[in-house]
Amino acid sequence: IGVSAGSCNAASFIGKNYRRQHDITINYCNDKRYMSIQSAFKNGQYINLDWDFGELTYEILPLDNETYENSGTQLCAVATNALTGKPEYFYPKDLREVGCPYLKASCALPIATKGVEIGGQTYFDGGLTDSIPLKRAFEDGCQKAVVILTQVRGFVKQPIKQQSAVRRILKKYAAIADAVLSRHEMYNNQLEYVFDMEKEGSCFVIAPAEDLHCSAVEKHTDKLEHIYQLGYAQGKLNAQKIKEFLKG
């Protein structure tokens, strides 16, 4: 189960495109077609999801749909319904649909991108309303879960200060504005639940060893490479422990 960029990480992992997200992040974060002021003026979105889930995904660094489809692993991608302000969960059996709409919707950051249309509904980033969907994983039948956090242990998310600006910019999407402004409460509650489940032995938690100080639109490739190497080291360090946890 993946949220926002995590859904793309999961799709690439299931398809055994193990360095795909690394290459996208490092090699294209400064590409004007992908993430730039120029894109904002030309395409109406700072992060050009149309290019990301178009030319980049189908021509430059394609997902291995055949491996994904035959993996026997089910991906769940979380997105937020713009009308209801509630999370919704999508289970793509393959990645053949043009534009990968479920992954695209899961990554659609308000303000930085446009909403994504699926079945006549508009969706935004799943992290707004279910940032750490551990409860959903259990509801889907998982008995044990591995949770990968992007913040250090002890992190507490603070409320956004520019509330009036958020409401003004997102006046077309009142429910999304509400979700943005209340996200800190949801996130902190979910963190508490994750650590409670860790104590009970229901989940294995991987958290960064240091504060990452990374923006959602980070462009410093040295910093991004450092973060990737930190995560890779954490994976190697915990690989055997995870195997034992899942078998136990």
Residue ranges and their predicted role:
Residues N70-I148, R153-R167:
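Active-site gating loop/helix substructures
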Residues P62-L63, D130-L134, N189-E192:
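Glycine-rich, charged/polar anion/phosphate-binding loops
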Residues Q190-G248:
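C-terminal helical/tail subdomains of lipid-metabolizing enzymes
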Residues K144-S202:
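Helix-centered, glycine/charged polyanion-binding patches within enzymatic domains
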Residues R33-I37, L170-K171, A209-E218:
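A short small-residue
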Residues I1-E59, Y91-A105, L149, R153-K161:
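Patatin-like phospholipase
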Residues S39-I47, K86-Y91, Q121-F124, D178-L181:
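Flexible, glycine/proline-enriched loop segments at strand-loop-helix junctions
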Residues I60-Q74:
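A short alpha-helix-loop-beta-strand transition element characteristic
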